[in-house]
């Protein structure tokens, strides 16, 4: 993988760890993430004059896949919040971030993108580590342990993450091609921000519509957590914009998804040593294996 992609993903991983740690400490219902994504929309409206010529040339295929990525991101944030409400950051986050590798790698095979043997070995290690972080002792292999509500919510969030990763790689390629065809192409550094902005607007509205089922939660979130939700919005937008930029340097999106797992180790460390979550050998070994 090209070194620019490595640098971009490492910076993104630190930002990702930060916003998930903040979200875990707050009320992470749909209202919280609706506010955070809404802040992203507001902050980057000034980009639209530069992006609009590109947006108007995007084909119908782009918009079809775009609907799928918004749905996938909605599922990701909704179920991630559910997982954080009943589970530990150091357990929910690794599951939500690692399982998408299986889906993305499988889809890559379907489209003729064959990962190298070292890459496949890395995928297997990440999945093994994901099982370990859920265990309290190495001798504990109870199926019930892996079917707790927090773990199930994390799995559903992982499905959303896999879905939008695949869709976003497809759409970023379309945007790059459309951009080169323009008489005055948009700066390549701005294209990922444009795409992320396009996603954030309908995503915020969708999450807000879900949150409307409980108006009291919306008021409580606005009163108690609006500042932290805004910070999460900035970090979320910046972190994923860096990932989208990194995708431009790789041919196989599974490499990007896999390398992002460095954030798993960071988040487990934060969960244990800063949030006071349960510390045990399998969890630490699992995080190291995934790293």
Predicted regions and their residues:
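Membrane-interface interhelical linkers
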Residues: 1-68, 77-87, 128, 135-155, ...
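C-terminal appended segment following the main domain
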Residues: 8, 236-291
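Specific alpha-helical transmembrane segments that line the substrate/conduction pathway
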Residues: 68-73, 84-130, 197-201, 252-273
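Short, well-ordered amphipathic alpha-helices
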Residues: 169-174, 271
């Amino acid at each position: 993988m090209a070194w620019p992609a490595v640098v971009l993903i490492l910076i993104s991983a630190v930002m990702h760890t930060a916003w998930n740690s903040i979200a875990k400490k707050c009320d992470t219902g749909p209202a919280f993430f609706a506010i955070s994504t809404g802040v992203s929309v507001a902050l980057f409206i000034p980009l639209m004059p530069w992006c609009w010529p590109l947006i108007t040339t995007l084909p119908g295929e782009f918009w079809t896949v775009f609907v799928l990525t918004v749905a996938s991101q909605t599922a990701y944030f909704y179920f991630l919040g559910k997982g954080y409400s009943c589970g530990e950051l150091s357990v929910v986050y690794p599951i939500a971030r690692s399982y998408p590798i299986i889906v993305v790698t499988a889809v890559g095979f379907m489209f003729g993108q064959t990962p190298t043997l070292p890459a496949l070995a890395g995928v297997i290690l990440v999945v093994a580590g994901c099982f370990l972080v859920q265990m309290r002792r190495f001798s504990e292999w109870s199926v019930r342990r892996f079917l707790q509500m927090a773990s199930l919510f994390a799995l559903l969030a992982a499905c959303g993450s896999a879905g939008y990763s695949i869709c976003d790689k497809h759409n970023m390629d379309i945007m790059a091609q459309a951009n080169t065809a323009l008489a005055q192409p948009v700066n390549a550094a701005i294209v990922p921000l444009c795409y992320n902005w396009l996603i954030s607007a309908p995503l915020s509205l969708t999450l807000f519509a879900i949150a409307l089922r409980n108006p009291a939660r919306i008021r409580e979130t606005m009163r108690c957590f609006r500042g932290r939700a805004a910070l999460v919005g900035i970090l979320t937008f910046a972190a994923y914009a860096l990932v989208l930029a990194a995708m431009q340097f790789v041919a196989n999106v599974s490499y990007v998804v896999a390398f992002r797992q460095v954030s798993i180790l960071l988040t487990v460390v934060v969960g244990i040593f800063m949030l006071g979550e349960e510390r045990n050998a399998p969890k630490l070994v699992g995080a190291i294996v995934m790293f």
